[in-house]
Amino acid sequence: AKIFSDIGWHSTVIEGGYKSYRKAVLGDLDYLPAKFRLIVLSGPTGTAKTHILRLAAESGLQVLDLERLANHRGSLLGSEPGSLQPAQRLFESRLCATLQNFSPDRPIFIEAESNKIGQIHVPSALWASMRQANRVSLTAPIDARIAFLQRDYRHIIEQPDHLIELLTGLCQRYSTATFDLWKTTIKARDWHGFVHNLLKTHYDPS
């Protein structure tokens, strides 16, 4: 802090150091979610939930974008190209700072997520509030969802070998015949057929 002050930067010292800061973050994450009225945007994969929420944020609504904070889209294929997820503690610090900037007088819109986004765990108090919140459910025709996913995941489609490698994470859940079908459609560049089968087999039943 002294060095920063010497060069003209404003700085403060946290009494108790990092342990004190960390305790404050965890304390805030325990009680802050209950202060807010959450509205959860849900719907099947491919209904553009994340895009809708980001447009809502641009229009001035309060939006808690967990996928952006976690740098992950929240599914097997959700890792962002060329970047890593933050450490759990960094995610929690960013989440805490975001919640502190919200007004309890206005609702917070948030996407339906599992309690784990990639390797990041959603804090239990926030997860409990999400489960109890009112929901807005999106729907879209299957062909519209397929077309959207082909555009939104173009970075994966352009790397078919990497896509097949990612899908090996599902090998234990599905039959060899199913996995072979996925590989066949990928190698044939039949993206409509591949996405349709993946939705029907993996995403929609869950």
Segments from the language model and where they lie:
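Glycine-rich phosphate-binding P-loop
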Residues: 37-58
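Phosphate-binding P-loop
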Residues: 29-36
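Thiolate-centered catalytic microenvironments shared by cysteine-dependent enzyme domains
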Residues: 1-20, 24
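Conserved nucleotide-sensing/catalytic segment adjacent to the nucleotide-binding pocket
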Residues: 58-129
